[in-house]
From Swiss-Prot:
This protein's record includes keyword Ribosomal protein: no
Species of provenance: Schizosaccharomyces pombe (strain 972 / ATCC 24843) (Fission yeast)
Gene Ontology cellular component list: cytosol; nucleus; RAVE complex
Localisation per UniProt entry: Cytoplasm; Nucleus
Protein name: Regulator of V-ATPase in vacuolar membrane protein 2
Amino acid sequence: MQTEIDASVIVKEKEWLETNVLPEFWESMSEGLKEALNLISSDDPTVLVFTSPKTDAVKGIVSRSSSNVVRVNVTAKVGRTTHVLKLKDSAIIHLDQILNLSNYMHYALYCLPRLRHNTERAIKELQEILHAIVCLLHSIMQEESEKEEIPSNASSISLKSQNSIVSRTSNPFSCLNHSPRQIHKTVRNHLFSPPLPSNLALSFSISNASVCLHLFRLSGPNEVLESFAKNSVDIEMLKPFVSQRIDAFSQDPILLAVTAKLSALQKKVNDVSYRFKTISSSLYGAK
């Protein structure tokens, strides 16, 4: 008799959650995703200042608009030589991490109305998508070669001391079976004016709500370096030829706001998931 009463109470609690909590939850998830998507998709340029307070290795300005870098005007000292890194006026650099981030948010918004009838599946799907997004925003490009670490107005990251993080985030899509491996590529040298010399390679990534600039000095056969300079290549291909690496980081206020919103949404999903799992396990135990 007591078991039947307990089961009845648990069923009523589950019904109350579905009636009073879930509608507001779905609405807040949809609104939060739309707000984050609008922020990250804005075409208004975000100007990022790269400075090196302890050294003068890297200094200048980078502008991001939506998922593209649209302006680069940076000076970099590599060895004894100072290079001017200036993106051509008509050129853009695609930030694949931000493009993937936008795609995931579009996918989440697409799934929400189609999965709401199946609470357990919808919550699980949202957990996976949001986990992938948060991993994507915190992914760190692995570094195995010698580099010079450059701080900026955002805290610099010691990549060699982050191996445990890299192992979890070098593939930020691993929690979704259909997702590809994140690949970091170089920028074609001819997109700059003047073009970068063939012994230099430049790449951008996103980490900890910052835009990260990675500059590589290369050594090797001229034909290999010329091939790298003409193409956008996977950073992994450069590693045998890297003699120096310089990293600079500048925190992006829009990425910071998006990260905060998505982290809050992730917490909401986890809280609702925990409540339903608790009710389900209690209901099972009462039978």
